[in-house]
Curated annotation (Swiss-Prot):
Protein name: Photosystem II reaction center protein H
Binding partners and assembly: PSII is composed of 1 copy each of membrane proteins PsbA, PsbB, PsbC, PsbD, PsbE, PsbF, PsbH, PsbI, PsbJ, PsbK, PsbL, PsbM, PsbT, PsbX, PsbY, PsbZ, Psb30/Ycf12, at least 3 peripheral proteins of the oxygen-evolving complex and a large number of cofactors. It forms dimeric complexes.
Alphabetical keyword list: Chloroplast, Membrane, Phosphoprotein, Photosynthesis, Photosystem II, Plastid, Thylakoid, Transmembrane, Transmembrane helix
SUPFAM superfamilies: Photosystem II 10 kDa phosphoprotein PsbH
Species for this entry: Glycine max (Soybean)
């Protein structure tokens, strides 16, 4: 047959590199969640400001806001 069996002792594990060793501490907090609300209120404020920004852009695009000194054709 054309199948080949590989023994467990012939396979090598993951290779260790300098970059991997430097980045490992960054991944050590994976899956952990800080208790409480954290930065949720800050994100809510950012989303509200972004929504206001988008509505202003939309009103300017629809020419529903008249800007002094700027002619909209």
């Amino acid at each position: 047959m054309a199948t080949q069996t590989v023994e467990d002792n012939s396979r090598s594990g993951p290779r260790r590199t300098v970059v991997g060793d430097l980045l490992k501490p960054l991944n050590s907090e994976y899956g952990k969640v800080a208790p409480g609300w954290g930065t949720t209120p800050l994100m809510g404020v950012a989303m509200a400001l972004f929504a206001i920004f988008l509505s202003i852009i939309l009103e300017i695009y629809n020419s529903s806001i008249l800007l002094d000194g700027i002619s909209m054709n």
